């Protein structure tokens, strides 16, 4: 099975920003080796909720169904059984078969007016405590499709009153229920809707009808970071350091809110209009006040030793993923990628990888301090932000129209 190019804001079949190019391959993995990984409790395949899956795919690991620790999601009503309307597995546009009895919700009841630096508009949302905006499909003008996925589609949209440009994700309840990933959607909505950071894609709210769930998201016109990596093959030190700095700042914020992402990879990162990085997919994230979990999830190439060995894990899994991502930025492929998933597991367990000669010594130092078998020995996020390689190379572009430093 090939690697996923999950696209929140650019379709695989509609060339929006630049032509799609084929990226590095990934070895298909239906489940982890029984001799090395604690087998999942359920037989539910781990499907991606957001973004297309009709393109080369990096295979997700089969996983248990995580439950929010000490947290009851407010989005429990998202996937109530449909009482009317025709459900179909064939993707439709959001304007087709409109249901007059739409149920609308806002997952952000205390939001102030949000100004978009990307579009220069403001999305009017409730400011008063307890007041909820009752969204419905008629509130939006639907534009061109941005992406097509296994569970639905993504559309460019504009809120009628404010003219705010956004992305509207349309997910089909029948397909979500068939795949058994309702819990994943609820968790994603619950977590992402409460996060406010310039390097995290904003989820403004959601609404649903008998057949579909609609997610109201920021529009990131720069598209998916993975496609940019495919286009450039690899990034230089300046561009890599800038992205790692922005991601470290976003993860530091998430961890302060007791949120573990657990699936950091290029496919889950988008670029804003100024080239800034944005975390866009929280499908595998978890709010874990207990800080210790055993669920196996994420992508094979990015799994840390403690997860493939079935040990308890905490927010330090994101430090490992940050190290893998930094290596992939600089080299163009993950450090533990091999011809077989068994060998990949072995190399991860042994932390066995090599650097090409063109990787700088300072970059090697940062990666090596993140890719530690013992989670407690990994460089913390504050240490990442203070690392000499990051400080030296992560200068922000001065002008909006200027390319990122080191862009190839």
From Swiss-Prot:
Gene name of this polypeptide: aurka-b
A cellular-component GO term for this protein: kinetochore
Please note every region of biased composition (Basic and acidic residues): 1-10
Q: Positions of the region Activation segment?
A: 287-300
Residues bound to ATP: 150, 169, 217-220, 281
UniProt xrefs under InterPro entries: Aur-like, AURKA, Kinase-like_dom_sf, Prot_kinase_dom, Protein_kinase_ATP_BS, Ser/Thr_kinase_AS
Give the annotated active site.
Answer: 263
What protein is this chain from?
Aurora kinase A-B
Gene Ontology molecular functions: ATP binding; kinesin binding; microtubule binding; protein kinase activity; protein serine kinase activity; protein serine/threonine kinase activity
Name the protein family: Belongs to the protein kinase superfamily. Ser/Thr protein kinase family. Aurora subfamily.
Query: Where do the TM regions start and end?
Result: none
- Locate the compositionally biased regions of type Polar residues: 85-110
EC id: 2.7.11.1
Task of the protein = Mitotic serine/threonine kinases that contributes to the regulation of cell cycle progression. Associates with the centrosome and the spindle microtubules during mitosis and plays a critical role in various mitotic events including the establishment of mitotic spindle, centrosome duplication, centrosome separation as well as maturation, chromosomal alignment, spindle assembly checkpoint, and cytokinesis. Phosphorylates numerous target proteins. Important for microtubule formation and/or stabilization.
Where does the Protein kinase domain start and stop, copy by copy?
140-390
Single biological process term from Gene Ontology: cell division
Instruction: Kindly provide the PTM information from the record.
Output: Phosphorylated. Autophosphorylated on a serine residue.
Which keywords has UniProt assigned to this entry? ATP-binding, Cell cycle, Cell division, Cytoplasm, Cytoskeleton, Kinase, Microtubule, Mitosis, Nucleotide-binding, Phosphoprotein, Serine/threonine-protein kinase, Transferase
Superkingdom of this protein's organism: Eukaryota
- Quaternary state and interactors: Interacts with kif2c and kif11.
What does the UniProt entry say about where the protein is found?
Cytoplasm, Cytoskeleton, Spindle pole; Cytoplasm, Cytoskeleton, Microtubule organizing center, Centrosome
Reactions catalysed, semicolon-separated, are:
L-seryl-[protein] + ATP = O-phospho-L-seryl-[protein] + ADP + H(+); L-threonyl-[protein] + ATP = O-phospho-L-threonyl-[protein] + ADP + H(+)
Give the span(s) annotated as Disordered.
1-128
